Amino acid sequence: MDEHPNKFYLFGGYTLWNEHAWSPSDDRVRGGKSRSLLVCSADSAVATFSGDLDITALGGAGFASQRTVDPQSWDLLVYQGLSLGVAKSDGKKYTLVLKDDTPPKRPDGREESTVSWEYDFVPGSETEVTASWADFKPTYRGKPKPDAAPLRLDHIKRISIMMRSFFGEQQGPFRLDLNYIAAIRAESMSED
């Protein structure tokens, strides 16, 4: 058997979803009112990321996200990207976020800001979204950070799914049903 399959399921697929492996990280940490949930189907085959994106409290800005709980660590060096199996989508724009470190805590208990690697996508229902590592762009507090050190693919510590306003572009209820999140090898990448 191949030590590194073409598709390595991080969540879903042969690795069932576990809602306890995820935690909310919403704009409430900055005084916002957005909320998110990640709930698994009865058979743990599908995870529903849903909530309400409220942009009124932060002047047109806002975000609602679910992130993996610490500690986690994935070595994805032999893979070329990530794939999301989408069961159902509301047609809104989502962001997949990777971190290669665990942010330290500030004295007030909140996490310090660190570089994130982000990929924006608008999924259809019953589709597969694929993103190569080059599709993930470094950001710091939501702004591009072109001088960031390269993403350490052998040291991925956190994965997040985010709904954000893109400064007033979208708001309100959202829902994305996912079959899986998987690391993929070149053989599995779809041609554009």
Where are these predicted regions, by residue range?
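Beta-rich carbohydrate-recognition modules and glycan-binding surfaces
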Residues: M1-D192
